[in-house]
Amino acid sequence: GLGILLVVLGHFIEQYRMGYSFVSASFFCICAFHMALFCICSGLVARFNPRKLVTQQLWLYLVGQTLMLAFRAAVLRENFAETGGLLAAWLLPWRHIWYLYALIFWHLTLPVLCRLRDRLGLAGSCLGMALAVGLALTAGLVDWPFTLVRVFAFYPFYACGVLLRPQLDRLAAFAAEHRPVQL
């Protein structure tokens, strides 16, 4: 809930940040961690289900991208020939649609992360984080079109959510068992 509120607030105050130091500082603080928080939460609740991946996420991405493409052509009068053609514009995420695109990619890696975490324990989680950070750093060396670099840049946060889930579940169970006595 807090993450959603911060995203909405951040997008709202973005247009008012110039000239107001408090608003600008608030915007910077929100932007510093809100996407990382979303990615960690996405990893914490992730479940691998190929059918849902296709019927929900892929479908939502394709419909959203098609609507955005129509908006860009009709309202913004964008010339797609300058950016690689209509097919490239349709396949590559535009602006905020990148998160749906990222979730599809990240969910495809979920079985590997879960196998590392479940079979190798803490060592597997450390290895999974090292691989995720390595992928993000390596992908940062490539000049990706549009916002694709975000898919890789935020991947370690998603992996962190996936890899830390058992520890957080154990912590929640421990806290539930050791509640203070209420009078």
Residue spans of the language-model regions?
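Functionally critical transmembrane alpha-helices in membrane proteins and complexes, commonly lining
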Residues: G1-F48, Q57-T66
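Hydrophobic alpha-helical transmembrane segments
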Residues: G3-F12, A73-V75, W94-Y99, F154-Y155, ...
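Hydrophobic alpha-helical segments of integral membrane proteins
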Residues: V7, I40, A46-R47, L69, ...
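Structural signature of transmembrane alpha-helix termini at the membrane-water interface
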Residues: L9-F12, Y16, L44-R47, R51, ...
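Interfacial loop-to-helix transition and helix-capping segments at the boundaries
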Residues: F22-M35, L87-A102, G140-F157, L183
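Hydrophobic cores of alpha-helical transmembrane segments in multi-pass inner/ER membrane proteins
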Residues: M35-V45, W98-L110, Y155-L163
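Membrane-interface helix-loop-helix regions
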Residues: Q56-L110, G124, G128-L141
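Aromatic-enriched alpha-helical transmembrane segments of multi-pass intramembrane proteins
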Residues: W90, C114-L183
